[in-house]
Amino acid sequence: MLLLGVAALPMCLFAQESNDSVPASWERELELNEVVVVANRPVVKQQNGKIIYMVKNDPYAKGLDGITILDRVPRISVSNGTVSVAGKGNVRYIIDGILMELDASAMAMRLQNLRAEDIEKIELLPNPPSRYAAEPNAVYISITTRNETLGTKGSIYGSLNQSDKLREYFSGSISHTTRKCDMSLDASVSNYYNTNYNDIEYSFLDGFPSRVSSTGTKSHMVESGFNALFRYKFAPDMNIGVIANFNYESVTSKGTNFTDYGGYISSSKSITKSKPNNALTLTGFYDWTFGSKGESMQLTYNYFNRHSPTVSDITTIYSNSAEDYGVNEEGKTNYRFHSMKADFKLPYRWAQLEAGMAYTDILNSSVNSLMSATMNRSEPKRESNSFDYSERIAAAYITASRNLGAGFWGKVGLRYEYTFTKGIQRSEGSVDRDEYGHLFPSINLSWNKDRIGSFNISYSMGMGRPNLWELNPFEYYSTADEYAAGNPNLKPTVYNNAEINYYGLGGLYTVLYTSFASDAIGYIRRFDETGIISTKPYNCLFTNKAGLYVNYRRTFFGRWEMKAGGEVFRTSSRSEVPDFKIRSMKDWSGKVEVSTNIMLNRPRTLIFSAQFTHFFPWQQNLINYESFQLFNLSLRYSLLNNRLNLQLKANDIFGWNKTRSKEHYADYTIRQKFNAHTAYVLFGISYRFGRDKVNGVWRPSKEDQSVRTK
């Protein structure tokens, strides 16, 4: 979560020395009589199953923020703030050991607050570590900030983003490190306007007139938050601390919908408010390194609380009726998590062992009410529901890794999770209970040879639990005759993932991957006898995806960098649900991508970048998608020894980023076109202050379930 404003921190009253480290000669770029001497150091390498991107060795990283710079890591693509990894599903982030448990928008703001100049390296972990909760085909991106000597440092960043409306964003951070304590504070505030349009056509196979609807939504979101850390060091090998994280959202959405039913039309207006939407995370931790071999223990407690109230009003006018139809919904949802974790590292001569155990208690309480009425109805129709859901997860894990000699390295891991769930629908008086346990093995084997490159083969098993809002059975209306609801009977989905990858030959990266799942969650739309459309999730899909991704990067003349890549994959989806007309789909597809970076001046401080990606038609979860393109340009300028950075960026200037899809049901076909209005022009400015040689102040919170609340 990114964070608002820069606030001064109280200084610890402990003596400290100013011991600035001096970079080695190969780390420095020297200007002597206008002759620039640049030493080439490895920018990317693959080691122990990880792709490692050394940011400090990359001259093209100047002025980039923490999200844009991810696009420079092989296999990672960044588009309009969305990060994806070829062959993978969920993307999780670790910053200096902190597993970031944020929703997509808050995570994007957190990354934007990072500067390339403050990042030491970025690691891509395709095989999820056993110490973290089992997830579906997950990939972890670990960012390590520069960790040097004592002192104070900070940064501020601001941007203006012109899309349909002007958007503003501001953030800042400050940290202070002494011999006895660490302190840090991040803060941010944003004021965003978004517009999107969604056109849907239902073509019925029985000759009934098509149903065509067009929906426009304009939303305004104000978001702010902060993250604070305090750590006290009893000794170099023992410390205790606390982390506080708070996020505030206020969202107002106004929508219009026009629907042609073939014989009559309807017009709807809606307004939805969600405010204040608050989330608080508190973490207490104790770290102790003991023994002659560097054995360590970490104890962590997490508390998470999210409060999400919503109010929605919908008014609909039908051309064949003189009455207005209104729907009013009010809801309050509270999430409370408690978790305790103990992690141990035992570096023996014969293997590096990691082991631990965890317990998580999840409580979700929702109260919802719905009122619908026509103008001349004396008594409106009222419905209400109270849904309470609890989930308790006990877990234990162990991993062992070691060098096997002759360039080989191996790692095996095993995690066990046992889960108890209970759901209560008080309006119906029903109680659903379930319990299940599962083992999640993982294995990783790599081989490195300097002149040949690095090969890595891995296998892992993961599990995707339903999002908490997917379990809530209450109906949320978007128009007077269309709603979405959850399904309290959803079960978790088990995923099997395997891949072989290679890096070498001066910048070639390639990966062959596969992932398959049974009883995956899919969404099904249905019409009732009155023509009302419902959308609900079900465990109804069997999916498989296998593909080959290749990426190559090369620098010419020391100033011009080119990157080209492509992906070819085969997807398979199958369902036994009779709602679908086509219950099995198999298809080949792929993408091509090319990007360039050019240094435009002698000091190498002015960099022009361009990026283009073309996606070919593909199918996913029995839905056919048409091709589309992504295109963006940027110009970055660094001043004051890289402390001041200016950026000008243009995204989707030709309006190519639109999603078109088709679904085949037994009785009808759905054609959909979604335009998120991603075109914008952005001007950003960042400034770093304080000493350059300062510790990064972070510590892992290890809270890993709050992502399921949004």
Regions picked out by a protein language model, each given a short descriptive name:
Residues E17-N57, V78-N80, K88-N90, P126-N127:
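Short, acidic, small-residue-rich periplasmic hinge/interaction motif at the N-terminus
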Residues Q16, L639-K710:
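C-terminal beta-signal and adjacent terminal beta-strands/loops
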Residues C181, G225-E249, K273-Q425, S446-N456, ...:
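Face-selective signature of the C-terminal outer-membrane beta-barrel domain
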Residues G66, R72, L99-P126:
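Short acidic/polar hinge/loop motifs at secondary-structure boundaries
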Residues E34, G66-I69, M107-M109, L124, ...:
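N-terminal periplasmic accessory domains that precede
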Residues V44, I67-L102:
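Extracytoplasmic beta-strand/coil segments of soluble accessory domains associated
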Residues F387-Y389, M463-L512, F516-S518, S534-A546, ...:
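Outer-membrane beta-barrel signature, preferentially recognizing the C-terminal barrel domain
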Residues K56-N57, L150-I174:
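Short strand-turn segments of transmembrane beta-barrel domains in outer membranes
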